[in-house]
Amino acid sequence: MKFDILTLFPAMFDGPLTESILKRAAEKGLIEVKLHNIRDFAFDRHSVTDDYPYGGGAGMVMKVEPLAACIEHAKVGSPRARVILTTPRGRSFNHAVAEELAREEALIIICGRYEGVDERVRELFVDDEISIGDFVLTGGEMAAMVLVDAVSRFVPGVLGSDESAVNDSFADGLLEYPQYTRPAEFRGLGVPSVLLSGNHQEIAKWRRRQSLGRTAASRPDLLTDAHLSASDREYLEELQRVAGSDG
């Protein structure tokens, strides 16, 4: 999986992309991340990449010429790449979108800045617009890091266990169950006995119910589209009855 990241600030990516899982994935050749400095494609000696908006208004707009040249340069090495613009107006990024993008051969990610990019960049080059949340960042670099990290988890071999991505929060539409490791007791708090029982059926049942409970408490909106069995629905109804009696 190849990621071409178009940015005005390539140094921002030094830490997040050169440590931990992403570092090992790159060393194994499972992913490739290539940074392209948009300033290198400016047409004037001052490397200007932004200008005042036509019609007036606050802030600056990223110019079309440097971005067009940078995108076309990236496409030489990744001709079938999907071009993504990080922007608050894009579709919401989530687990399913990350899995979808992981099926692409390559992604070209444009990191927006200032008041945004010249609309002609969208019209001529952009295949998809992605937002990581209903808030505004200084630039698209942080969003690009999120995309690379989340998408890479679906690339075969990137995670230590093939089950890791499957069992992550949101993989089945629910939040993940609580996790414990040694020691078995810490400051009076012990590990739930079921996890020490060796009974895998009961462990699976406990984990499922914990996921349901956590999701109902913190992200009830996820339950609408979650894959729920009859047993799941009965348990959720039981939780509602208990909550109602406590209230």
From Swiss-Prot:
Its main location: cytoplasm. S-adenosyl-L-methionine binds at residues 112, 132-137. Pfam families: tRNA_m1G_MT. Signal peptide: none annotated. It is found in: Cytoplasm. NCBIfam families: PRK00026.1, trmD. Belongs to the RNA methyltransferase TrmD family. Specifically methylates guanosine-37 in various tRNAs. This is tRNA (guanine-N(1)-)-methyltransferase. It comes from Geotalea uraniireducens (strain Rf4) (Geobacter uraniireducens).
